[in-house]
């Protein structure tokens, strides 16, 4: 029975994200193959317009 706290140390092995070729941010997921910031590696680019302009989250809470 070794679930829980002792197993959490196993999660920090290796890199999950590397630098994205398109936007340059450290958001490109190696396993999934796309960038979490700009969407590089997918068919469409991720657009985050209004929330970035206003500087706060937009939508239902």
UniProtKB/Swiss-Prot annotation:
Zn finger intervals (C4-type): 20-38
GO cellular component terms given for this protein: ribonucleoprotein complex; ribosome
Cofactor or coenzyme needed: Zn(2+)
PROSITE patterns: RIBOSOMAL_L37E
InterPro entries reported for this sequence: Ribosomal_eL37, Ribosomal_eL37/eL43, Ribosomal_eL37_CS, Ribosomal_zn-bd
One Pfam family named in its UniProt record: Ribosomal_L37e
Single GO MF annotation: zinc ion binding
Protein purpose: Binds to the 23S rRNA.
Official protein name in the record: Large ribosomal subunit protein eL37
Species name: Caldivirga maquilingensis (strain ATCC 700844 / DSM 13496 / JCM 10307 / IC-167)
Encoding gene per record: rpl37e
